[in-house]
Structure formats: C-alpha cells, structure tokens
C-alpha cells in the first residue's frame, strides 16, 4: 500500500484559523456582554424606582468589552457576570427578578439592606431554556411581603444559601431545592404551620435553619429527618405545648446550636432527656414556661456546651444545681429570671476555669458570693442583680476578679462602705458598674477615672451615697451614662462633666443638689439624650444651652426652684419626647414653638406661674409622631387621684434601679394617700402617626380660651387644664379626643354647655369640670352621668344626672295689668284660669311623652350594653328578646335571688352615684351604697376606666370571680357593662373596712377589743387561704391590705377585691405597664425587684394586716416611723421592747400578753424577707388552731386541714 503523505498547513493558514477563533470568541464575548448589560439595565429600569445615593448612575447602555463588569456592584469571571452585590445602597422599588435570572452565569445575588418591595410569590422562572445558576441569594432587610417564591425556588435547582430574613413574608412557597444548605427566614411574619412542619421534616440536606422571630404556632415535630442540621433557631415565635420527649436526644449528631427561646412551651423538664447533645455548644431555652426543681441531670451529657441559657422561665426553682460544674467547656451561663433559691454554692466556682459570663439575676438567692469566685480569672460579665444577697462580698470577693468588665448587682441588700475605691484599684477593665438599690454609703472617690479609663456606665441610684458629684468624673472620657439618683448628694453639678463627648444619660433626680444649673450643655458634643435632674433644689433660670442638645429625648427639671421663662429654643429639639418642667416658679408664656417638637408625647408644665394664652400650635405635631424614639426607657408614673394637696395629673419618673418601696416615703407619694404607682418600660408606638399623649398645664394663671386644635390630638390620654383662668366654651372639637382617659377642666371660668359629643368618649375615666360657669344639661349618653356630683359642682347653671333635675319652663301668660271693672276682671280671670289649666295640662302631656320616650331609648341603650353573671353557665351575655325586658344583673349567690335588677335601679338607688352615697374609693374604683326598692342594701363598685380588657376578657374574669363563694370572701352578686363602664355589685358590709375601723377611730367611733381583732385576723386568713389552696385555679390576691378586709354587722371579716388586680390594666396599650402589685407599706421586698406576684407575697401583706391589728398603727406613717415603716419599726422593737409594740387599748382587753406574743410571732414569720421561709396560709391557719387550744376561743372549730387542700364544714363554703 502506498504511503499517505500528510501535508502540513502553511503557517499562514494556521494564523488565519487562530485569528478566526479569536474573532469568534471576541464576537461572542461582545454579544454576551451586550446581553448581560441589557439584562442588568432591564432589571434597573423595572426594579429601581429610587436611587438616592446615585449608586447605579454609572450603569449605562454599552457594548464595550469589559462592560458591565466595571459597573458598581457587578463582579465577573471570564468576562461573565458571576455576582451582583447591591447591598446597603438605599435602593427602592418593586423588585423584578426575571431580568436577573436571565444572567446565565450569575452565582451570587445580594440585595440586602435596601427598600425593595413586592410580592415574591409572583416571581417566576426566566423564560429561557438555560436553568437558574444561582447558588447564593440574600434579599434580607427589605420590605417584601406575600408568600415565598415557589416558581423561583423550583427553577434554581443548585441554590445552596437563601436569606429572606427581615421582611414581611407570611408563608408558603415550599418545597425547597434539595441542594439547599443554609436557610434564613427569621424576622418575618411567617405563620404557615405547613411551612414549619416541612422545614423540620423536609430538611434532609440543610445545615443551617433559622426561623426565629416569626409567628409560628402549635407544637414541634421531631428533628430526626434533619440529619445534617447543625444550627437550628426557632426562637421568638408563638409555639406552645410540650417538646417531644426526646427532641434533643434524637437530634442529629451534627447539632451544635439549638434555640427555642421566647416561645410558650410549658412542661416539667426535671427528668428531660438530653442524651443526644454530645456536640451541642449552645442551648437556649430561655423565656418559655418551663418548670423544674433544679435542672435536668442529663444536661451533663452536653459535655461540649459553651453557652447555656435558661433565663426568664420564672418556674425553675430550688438550689442552683452543682452538677453544672461537669460542663467543663461552659463559658456563658444564664439562669436569670427564675425562682432559684438558697445560697450560691462555692462548688460552682469550679466553672471559673472557663466561665466568661455569669448571669444569676432576678432569682431569690440569699447569702453572699463565695470567696472562691475570686479565682474566676476569665470572668468578664457578672450579673447578680434582683436577688436578696447580702454582706460585703463586693470588696472581699469581686475585687479579686481582675478580668471583670461588666458588674451588675442592683436590687440586693449588699452593705458596707462604698466599694468603688477597691473596684477601681483592682478591676481596671471595668466598663459598667451597676450597684443601684443597695445600702452603700460614703462618697464617690475623686480619682475614680484615673483607675478606670474604660468606664462607660456608672449606676449608683437608690443608695446612701453622700458628698458631692466630683468634677473629676470628666476624666472618664468614655463615660456614657451617669445615674446617681435617689441618694444624699449635695452641692452643685460640676460643669466639667457636661463636656464629656460620649455622655448620653445624666440622671441625678431626688438628691439635695442646689445652686444654678450650669449653662454648659452640648458645647463639645450633642450626644446627650436623657437629662433628668428633677426634685432637687436648683435655682435660677433654665440654661439656654440645653436647646443645643439636638438629640435630647427626655428632659426633666421638675420639682426645683427654677424661675424665668421657658426657652423658646426647645422647639428646635426634634427628638424631644418627654418635657417636664412642672413644680417650679417659671413665668412668662407657654412657648408656641413647643408645637414644632415633632416627637413630643409628654408635656408637663403644671404648678408654675405661667401666664398668657395657651398656644394652639401645641397641637401642630398631631398626626406626625411615630413615638418609637422613646422606646425602652424605664419609668414610674405616680397617678394622682384627686385633691389640691397633690396638684397635677401625676408624676413621671426615670426609674432605672429604684426600689418602689422607697418611693413610699417620697413627698409625691406619702403626702398623697390616693396616689398609685405604675411602672414599666416605654414602648410608645402608634398604628398610624400619633400625637401627644399627656398634656398638663394645670395650676398656672393661663387665660383666654381653650384651643380647638387640641381636638386633633387623637392619641391624647391625659389633658389637665384645671386651676387656671380660662374662659369661653369647651370646644366641640374635643369630641375628637377618642383616646382621652382623664380630662380636667376644673377651677376655671368656662361658660356654655358640655358638648353632647362627650358621650362618645368611650375611654374617659376621669372627668372634672367643677368650679366653672357651665350651663345646660349634662349629656346623658356615654358615662358622663356615672361620675360623682363633685365633678360637676359649683356650676350654677348645670343640671341633670348626677346633679338636680333640669327644670324646663313651658311658658305661661301673666295676669293683665289693666282693670276694666269687677265683672270684666272676673270674666278674664275665669278665662285665664281655664287657659292656664289647658296649657299646663298640655305641657304636662308633652313632658310625660318626652320622658317616656327618653326612658324607653335609655332602656334600649342600657339593654344593649349590659351582661349578667350566670354561674354555672357558659353564656357570658344574652341577646334581647322582642319583649324589651330590662336586662338584669343576676344575683347568683342568694338562695332566693332578688328580682331582676337594672342599671336604672342602681342609678336610682345611689342617687345618680352622688357623693352622699360614696362609701369608699381605692385603686380599682369607687364604691357606692345602694338601697334597693325592696329594702335590700348592696355595694356598687364603679371600676376605674384605665383598662385594656375587652368585653370577652372582662366577662370571662367576672364569670370566674362570680363562682367563688366562701364565708370569708365578699361575694360578687353580679356585674353590668354599659359601653366602657363596668359596675360590680357586692354584698354590703355594715361596718366598712378594717382600715376605717382601726385608723379612723374618730369617725368610726368604735374600739376593737382583742377578741374581735382575733376574730378578724382568723377570718381574713381563712379567706386568703381559700383563695390560695382551694380555688381552681388558685388565685393570688395581689393587693391584700386592711382596706380590703371588710366587716359585717358582727365584725366577721371578708376579704374583698380578690381577682381585681389581674383584671385591671393600669394604662392604655401605648405603654407596656405593670401596675405595682400592692399598696406601699404592704408590698413584699421581692415585688420591688421584679414585680412578680406570688402567694408568698400575699402572705407578707397579710402579715402587715396582722401587725395593724396588734399595734393599731398604719403601715406607713412618716410622723411615726420617719423613713422606715411599720414592718421595720416592729422588727427593731421585737428584740427587747416587745410590750411597746401592742396597741395600748389591747392590754386592757386581754388577760394574756402571751397570746399577743404568739400572734406577733406569726406576723413576723409572714414578714420574713425570704419568701421561701414564709409559711403558707394553711400553715398560718394551723398555727392559729394550735393557739386556740389554750385560748378557749371557737373561731376555728369548723376548720380542718389535709396535706393538699383546705375544707370547711360550713355549708356556705365550696
């Protein structure tokens, strides 16, 4: 075969071929670049409606090679767009993904931190053959809504990372591509149960799953299918029920992070199995409703655990388990907000080898911190606040922890000299020192800052710190917060500290500071947000330099001796939310410029010497306020019920680290017996842009008319213009104050009528127009007729319920003035007499018809709003029949119930709820004596209107309380709802309250002998024991006191107001508020730390009542006890002056001082500072019964006990 000769191509041919290939690739690159540029521009045109920073201004239509790879946010590889990162560019518009999906090489898309919006469920796959190449997508922190993009997820089969967090997605959109490894859907509004179940059962390849901060409900499935998951975050949802028994034990071996914090899981975890947690490094089960004595022993199987958080469950109790020391890798331990008791074991100090953060705050721990904790050489954060720790361990133990950066010890009973010198010299890294509400004394060392250069927060409120505020604090250049309130400081504010560049909070209220306030604010820095220096003795003018503090949120200069005018420059402070200048001697006008403060929600100028008219511009911010700027501030509000002793609607305090029991001796409290204390955290938010919520201009000399523009402040809750010189009419525009709760216009010179539309102010709780010149009839709609007559008195032309009836002149002719002789006179007299008779008869018929029609309409209105208590029935209200029978309050407790009782009957029986029938008032409302037509007497309680309860919640609560019957509980006979009015009907107690009989002897005119007092003590204890141990569910009273112990004609004791504290919500929904449960003088020490109510708290309050019976003294009496109270006085006297404790009248009525001493011992046991050492009420009754053997009394003959319950043989008990 002949050989084939291969002829090599000429070099020129090869060059031509190579050139052709290059040209072909170049052409394709140019074409591809043009296509990708077109896709990006299409995306920009379709999705970017606003680009305020001009981030995409450089995107232009170009086909130049390298474009669009040089465009902002675009990254390329091999000339193709591989990544698009537009994060944080403030772009906005309705997102369209279609164009971007046309980029066939796009692997990573990052649009987080913009303002894109739209419904993601409408985003489909691109209309092309090539599949989606995306591997990583992050569109978090935008405003997307709707469900997940199902078609998008289906088309992107290679997607591995998907971040949809911080949007407003609601659910749907699964299944996910099997390639997915990381899924973050946190901080949305997801509630789809199917999505939750799929995420936890269809997660075969997912390694990271974050569903936190959504709205998922229901229970959890197991985790067995999630074989690869290592991070699972289900925190801050609405899930409930119990966890699967082996939820952790059967978890994947790869699981390292597990959080179910902030849900509503409720179960006993004492024996919970954690066996499968060998690789777990973080376990966060905080803020649920888990209960256990100690912690489950199986936790020691989690040997690699670095962070354990069981805080905020409130039901974990017993000693802190020492087996935790077996977790040898533990760096962060938080057991805060539970009920752990006892002392901190020194064995726990073994954890010091690794521990960096230890939080045991808000428990019931006692004793001291063991000395061995001084060896924690890695510990940086130590929080032992809100316990009952004592001793001087700060100086002896904590000062040895040189690594410490954050030290929080507020609300304990730690004593000793000021520990700051030792802390400063031995803990040089400290950034936060919080020693509030302890018993430290001494001065603040002048060289503090030279030893603590990193100090950011110095919090020493509510101690006994004396001396002056050292000017050397200005050397703490990193200082952000200074709180020295409620101490014994004197002298002036050193101007040097006002030059601190980072100072945000300066809080010095309730000291003895004096002099002029330095005019040196905000020259070097405008960081200051909180300036609260109220209730000192400052003089001079308000410094003009404060107007330079443009970031100021809370400014309080109240309760000083300031003079001069209010700076108009305050109107430039756009962040100012709370302005308190009340109780000074300020003069001049109210600056109209304050209306320019676009975030001002609280303005208190009461009790000054202001003159001029009220500027209508104050309402200019209505509809503009968002309110979020003041969120998170700790506050206390002392609400004044009434009276000139305490002017103004109330006092707002900055309340971080202040004990409520110390407020009891504060002048604003102990001078005002009707003042109640509310505490909480501000979370002012408005569904729409809101308005001011508190405005108090009372007790000034303001003149002119009331601005009608105030009616635009639809979120206004408190408006007090009383005690001024205002004239004119009440503006009809006030009917627009839909949220008003307290309106005081008293002691002015107002004329005209009360606007009829006031009957539509459904939240009105307190209304006072007394001492004006008003005329006309009080509107009968709404709740205006339910306020006492005192709120309308001294208005000579005002009439109607609850005042005297209005007299309508029907008009009648007069006698003729000219005489025409006897016959004409007689004839005319007869004619006039007949005419007058006819006119009078006709007028009477008209009046009768109008009254009949009025009462018919009123009956319909009342029928539409009343409900009856139906014990034993599931119905909480009933519909009217066609007969129109007046709706009744069912007297369920009587064996032979009274006939149907209507609201009209109660109104008539109390004479329109007039002052003459008022027999008592308290924190929950006013009580009236009502004598019914059949002779029966009942007590009618008109609840205060500050309530967040809806009809369903109120009715359910009343149905529960109405079924509780016991011989020593005041029975609820029925209730009535009329609009927002709530009336409760109780049995009438002839002898009133124990408080009245004991402490108002002049008016009560009765002395109680020991036998009667003993009878009252046992009866009230029996009633309280029934609530604690025999009611289902058990009831915590929350406000046990002598005024809630009522006495019948035989001086038998009845506990009243049980269940009421839970029913009442102190303020409206714009504040997250918890009313201080209890009354000053009766509040147990642990309530002053975390406001958590317990039966042992009731036991403490009962102990105070028992002391009142033994001593005859009031719980709080500054003239008797000074800064202390009855409990403190008795504990001082009981050691060696016991006989001086008893009421002298008792010594004359009892032959046995031993019995008095036995009852005193019971009282002291009830008043133990440690709740776990107090007896239960059953144990109190047992002790009483033991004493009875010697005393010969028969008060307890019908009382029996067993291990679990309390029963009585009386037929009245249930």
Swiss-Prot record:
It is found in: Cell membrane. ATP binds at residues 919-927, 941, 987-989, 993-996, 1039-1044, 1057. It is a single-pass type I membrane protein. Its main location: membrane. Coiled coil: none annotated. PROSITE patterns: PROTEIN_KINASE_ATP, PROTEIN_KINASE_DOM, PROTEIN_KINASE_ST. The active site is at residue 1039. It catalyses: L-seryl-[protein] + ATP = O-phospho-L-seryl-[protein] + ADP + H(+); L-threonyl-[protein] + ATP = O-phospho-L-threonyl-[protein] + ADP + H(+). Belongs to the protein kinase superfamily. Ser/Thr protein kinase family. This is Brassinosteroid LRR receptor kinase BRL3. It comes from Oryza sativa subsp. japonica (Rice).
